[in-house]
């Protein structure tokens, strides 16, 4: 039974899973949208929402937490500069997951996750 198992495992050890989510979050914020598998998209969605909420806060502590999570320092600065004007009136729901066709090789469910 999966009682209180809230973290999607994604078939990886903890360190690889964290690195994967950090990388996906960095790429999503950089490019605005990425195409990945549906479970990965759902997992990275909460991480990106957390980073945008930190950027809306705008404090020095929030900036340092984002710098510790995302891989690109310049990307953090641009996120903090534009987050307030882009997402100022929104209370969450900064990303959207759209289902797309299944992957040809292994028939995995694919999804496009994008920033709103």
From Swiss-Prot:
GO CC annotation: cytosolic large ribosomal subunit
Gene Ontology MF: a single term: structural constituent of ribosome
Matches recorded under Pfam families: Ribosomal_L17
Transmembrane intervals: none
Biological processes annotated in GO: translation
Highest taxon in the source lineage: Bacteria
Presence of keyword Cytoplasm: no
InterPro entries: Ribosomal_bL17, Ribosomal_bL17_CS, Ribosomal_bL17_sf
Alphabetically ordered keywords of this record: Ribonucleoprotein, Ribosomal protein
PROSITE patterns xrefs: RIBOSOMAL_L17 (PS01167)
NCBIfam families noted in UniProt: L17
Family: Belongs to the bacterial ribosomal protein bL17 family.
Matching PANTHER family: LARGE RIBOSOMAL SUBUNIT PROTEIN BL17M, RIBOSOMAL PROTEIN L17
Complexes and interactors: Part of the 50S ribosomal subunit. Contacts protein L32.
Name of this protein: Large ribosomal subunit protein bL17
Highest classification ranks of the organism: Bacteria, Bacillati, Cyanobacteriota, Cyanophyceae, Oscillatoriophycideae
């Amino acid at each position: 039974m999966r009682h209180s198992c809230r973290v999607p495992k994604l078939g990886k050890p903890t360190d690889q899973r964290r690195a994967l989510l950090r990388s996906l979050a960095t790429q999503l914020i950089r490019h605005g949208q990425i195409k990945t598998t549906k479970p990965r998209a759902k997992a990275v969605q909460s991480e990106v929402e957390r980073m945008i909420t930190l950027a809306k806060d705008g404090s020095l502590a929030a900036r340092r937490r984002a710098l510790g999570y995302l891989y690109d320092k310049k990307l953090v600065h641009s996120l903090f500069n534009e987050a307030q004007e882009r997402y100022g009136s929104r209370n969450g729901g900064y990303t959207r997951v759209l289902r797309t066709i299944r992957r040809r090789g292994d028939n995995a469910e694919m999804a496009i996750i994008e920033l709103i």
